[in-house]
């Protein structure tokens, strides 16, 4: 409960000029050696109707003087007790501190308010449960470099040297630049690289740059700068990776400035899909087209985004010089997006990729690619014929045309379009294997026989004639006569000989007369 006097003092904002010193003392509104005191506003006071101070500044002054009465008055005016304690610590007025000691639950709370290192240390000493390391940690946290300087020799003591790393990290986390610089120059930091992780996480370029000063100055002092070039590059590459992963272009440029590898930076930008960083580096560093093409291979290998691929292709005008290498990566990594982008720019590498797929990939990969790019069966089969992939042709043609008769029909049409003899022979062999695997209708077998004659497929025709004779006998008379005419017209003597043999069988069986035979041969002349 407040007394009536306290209530009056708390709410007095104006003092009459004719109040005597005695009256002011009686009211408790007199500050020894300063004069009258009263509230001016909520957070300030007026001394002797002239000097205006904030309540907390006045509290610190009263604490320095050990004036408990004024402290009590200022607390009544909603001042912060911490400032009175700080003032008392500064001038070692421990009577005042003892009076209010019980009201301070945690002495660490006062530390951010203290500017003087000696007072700072005195305040921390009142935290009886804390140790020397706790003092150093708070010195770092609240930027009291002089305390660290004071205890430098203690920090170098082998018993607590291991604490240097945690103090360094704390300084970095609180961005105490002066302390970081001092630690770097005066103390052995076990893992100085921590500064870079913190700088990247907080996007603090100044801290990032300071890290290089600390590391390279240390190496210089130790005389190992040249000997550590390999280690240096490992560190720089790691920093490039961190910076690019977080999309921090200024950090990338800072690392390059300190010797980072531009090609490594470009590679990381590609693999991390950092298009803006990649674009900037290519333009500013005048990257050569062959290097950009290698980056394109890397982008394909890593399944990079459309934007990344488009950017790289745009720098080489969508013209790939080493098509073979690009195709190899597309096939190996099953990364076809680049083909679609090139198709949009009228650059077709689909056939080249299909050829490599047919050569080196599985049925499932080829089928997926054919479906993805809507490739015509004729195009695929011609490539597969050229590469002698009979099993692949049989499997995929079966997928396309489930009906064997339909399959043979379409394959026969493709044979007509193949210009070279070995290719036609290869595909005809496949057609014959399909015939051997299924039971075709009689009329389809007859069509196949005439097809064999037209392409001089001697062995297959002979095989078909044998089947027809054994299963249809004399019913094949018309076919043999037709085949005789075709063989003569195309000048295929071996086929003509086979047909003549079966015409003799027909004659022996009485299915054809001598006159009909003579008439057939006369028609050929």
Swiss-Prot record:
What InterPro entries is this protein classified in? Answer: Ankyrin_rpt-contain_sf, MGF_505
Is Nucleotide-binding tagged as a keyword? no
Keyword annotations of the record: ANK repeat, Repeat
The residues bearing each ANK repeat, given as ranges, are: 54-83, 129-158, 261-291, 324-351
What does this protein do, in the record's words? Plays a role in virus cell tropism, and may be required for efficient virus replication in macrophages.
Sequence similarity:
Belongs to the asfivirus MGF 505 family.
This chain belongs to the protein called Protein MGF 505-6R
- Which organism does this record belong to? African swine fever virus (isolate Warthog/Namibia/Wart80/1980)
């Amino acid at each position: 409960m407040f007394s009536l006097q306290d209530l009056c003092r708390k709410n007095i904002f104006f003092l009459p000029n004719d109040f005597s010193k005695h009256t002011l003392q009686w009211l408790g509104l007199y500050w020894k050696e300063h004069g009258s005191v009263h509230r001016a506003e909520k957070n300030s006071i007026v001394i002797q109707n002239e000097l205006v101070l904030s309540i907390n500044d006045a509290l610190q002054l009263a604490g320095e003087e050990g004036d408990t009465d004024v402290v009590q008055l200022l607390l009544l005016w909603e001042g912060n007790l911490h400032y009175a304690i700080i003032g008392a610590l500064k001038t070692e007025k421990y009577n005042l501190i003892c009076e209010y000691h019980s009201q301070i639950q945690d002495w660490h709370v006062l530390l951010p308010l203290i500017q003087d290192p000696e007072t700072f240390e005195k305040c921390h000493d009142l935290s009886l449960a804390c140790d020397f390391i706790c003092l150093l940690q708070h010195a770092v946290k609240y930027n009291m470099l002089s305390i660290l300087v004071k205890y430098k020799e203690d920090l170098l003591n082998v018993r607590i040297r291991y604490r240097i790393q945690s103090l360094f990290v704390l300084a970095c986390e609180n961005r105490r630049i002066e302390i970081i610089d001092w630690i770097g120059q005066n103390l052995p930091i076990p893992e100085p690289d921590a500064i870079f992780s913190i700088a990247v996480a907080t996007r603090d370029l100044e801290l990032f740059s300071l890290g290089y000063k600390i590391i390279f100055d240390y190496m210089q002092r130790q005389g190992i700068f040249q000997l550590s070039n390999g280690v240096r590059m490992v560190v720089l590459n790691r920093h490039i990776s961190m910076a690019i992963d977080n999309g921090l272009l200024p950090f990338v440029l800072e690392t390059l400035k300190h010797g980072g590898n531009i090609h490594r930076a470009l590679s990381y930008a590609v693999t991390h899909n950092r298009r803006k960083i990649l674009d900037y580096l290519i333009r500013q560093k005048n990257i050569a087209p062959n290097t950009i093409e290698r980056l394109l291979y890397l982008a394909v290998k890593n399944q990079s985004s459309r934007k990344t691929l488009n950017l790289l292709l745009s720098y080489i005008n969508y013209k790939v010089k080493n098509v073979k290498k690009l195709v190899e990566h597309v096939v190996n990594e099953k990364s076809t997006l680049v083909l679609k982008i090139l198709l949009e720019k009228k650059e077709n590498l689909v056939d080249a990729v299909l050829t490599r797929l047919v050569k080196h990939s599985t049925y499932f990969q080829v089928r997926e690619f054919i479906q993805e790019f809507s490739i015509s069966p004729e195009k695929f089969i011609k490539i597969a014929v050229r590469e002698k992939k009979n099993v692949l042709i049989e499997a995929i043609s079966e997928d396309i045309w489930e009906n064997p008769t339909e399959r043979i029909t379409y394959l026969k049409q493709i044979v007509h379009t193949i210009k070279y003899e070995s290719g036609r022979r290869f595909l005809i062999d496949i057609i014959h294997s399909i015939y051997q695997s299924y039971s075709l209708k009689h009329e389809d077998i007859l069509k196949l026989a005439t097809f064999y004659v037209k392409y001089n497929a001697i062995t297959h025709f002979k095989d078909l004639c044998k089947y027809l004779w054994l299963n249809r006998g004399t019913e094949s008379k018309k076919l043999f006569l037709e085949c005789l005419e075709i063989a003569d017209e195309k000048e295929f003597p071996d086929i003509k000989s086979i047909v003549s043999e079966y015409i003799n069988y027909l004659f022996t069986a009485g299915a054809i007369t001598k006159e009909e035979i003579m008439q057939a041969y006369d028609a050929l002349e």
